[in-house]
Swiss-Prot record:
Organism: Emericella variicolor
Superkingdom of origin organism: Eukaryota
Active site feature: S137, Y151, K155
UniProt EC number: 1.1.1.-
Keyword Signal found: yes
Effect of disrupting the coding gene: Impairs the synthesis of anditomin but accumulates preandiloid A.
Pfam families in UniProt: adh_short_C2
Keywords: NADP, Oxidoreductase, Signal
A Gene Ontology molecular function term of the record: oxidoreductase activity
Residues making up the signal peptide according to the UniProt record: 1-25
Function: Short chain dehydrogenase; part of the gene cluster that mediates the biosynthesis of anditomin, a fungal meroterpenoid. The first step of the pathway is the synthesis of 3,5-dimethylorsellinic acid (DMOA) by the polyketide synthase andM. DMOA is then converted to the phthalide compound 5,7-dihydroxy-4,6-dimethylphthalide (DHDMP) by the cytochrome P450 monooxygenase andK, which is further prenylated by the prenyltransferase andD to yield farnesyl-DHDMP. Further epoxidation by the FAD-dependent monooxygenase andE leads to epoxyfarnesyl-DHDMP.
Positions of NADP(+) binding: I11, D57, R119, Y151, K155
Protein name in the entry: Short chain dehydrogenase andC
Pathway(s) this gene product operates in, as recorded in its UniProt entry: Secondary metabolite biosynthesis; terpenoid biosynthesis
Gene name of the record: andC
């Protein structure tokens, strides 16, 4: 019997990367997982009877409500955990160059969507008298010297939300924690569109942590283990924490 046996857990970004690794590991620990992603459902999990999936854009105004309703329809009136893993990068734009499109999209996916999902699950958790929410922040949630202004704002904001929710609902059995991840995973796209001057300004900080030539130093599966610890009863007294998963990058 796994340490998440029969727990119902919602995981965003479940089609790939950290989200998929977390969904896979949660299922291995006995959880019933409801995944959400803009991409198609992962083929590796489609045959698992304890996995349900909603393909949707988290920024659609009705997506959080639809997702929670679909989870309840699949697994019953119970949500033990919410893992907000989905996120997008910006183009490293600074305050003098960030476009409205990049700013709005980054804040919508990285900050607004997690908050709106929390708004939907907290009443269910409150009724049960327990629940655990884990948000995925970043080195950029702790530092101003690792990414663009939009991504930095969104991840700082998510840490603030985490602490606010932890304090507000601590007497109702609801916990809220965050991890701060440092990894190159997901760094895709047309790099020619990125703010090259801003990237150069961040390069010394990046170089202090990872060899940019060999890619990620932290595996998705390693990040997933910390997420699962925080959503599980193993961390029942951990609340309002921000745990770095960054191989000591947060020390600089």
């Amino acid at each position: 019997m796994g340490f998440l046996q029969d727990k119902v857990v919602i995981i965003t970004g479940a089609a790939a990367g950290i989200g998929l690794a977390t969904a896979t590991a949660a299922l291995d620990e006995g959880a019933r997982v409801f995944g959400i992603d803009l991409a198609p459902a992962p083929t590796s999990l489609q045959e698992n009877p304890n996995f349900e999936f909603l393909r949707a854009d988290l920024t659609d105004h009705d997506c959080p409500k639809r997702a929670v309703q679909a989870c309840i329809a699949a697994f019953g009136q119970r949500i033990d955990g919410l893992l907000n893993v989905a996120g997008i990068a910006d183009n490293y734009g600074s305050a003098d160059s960030v476009t409205d499109e990049v700013w709005d999209r980054c804040l919508a996916v990285n900050l607004a969507a997690p908050v709106k999902l929390m708004r939907e699950v907290i009443p269910i958790m409150r009724e049960a008298g327990k629940g655990s929410i884990v948000n995925t922040s970043s080195k950029a949630g702790l530092s101003g010297a690792s990414s663009g202004v939009a991504y930095t704002a969104s991840k700082h904001g998510l840490i603030g939300v985490t602490k606010n929710v932890a304090w507000r609902f601590k007497t109702e059995g609801i916990r809220c924690n965050a991890i701060s991840v440092a990894t190159e995973m997901g760094m895709t796209g047309d790099f020619s569109l990125w703010d090259q001057a801003a990237m150069e300004a961040m390069r010394p900080i990046h170089a202090a942590h990872m060899d940019m030539g060999i890619g990620a130093t932290i595996k998705a599966e390693e990040v997933a283990q910390t997420l699962l610890f925080l959503v599980s009863d193993l961390s029942r007294r951990v609340n309002g924490a921000v745990i770095p998963v960054d191989d000591a990058w947060s020390t600089i």
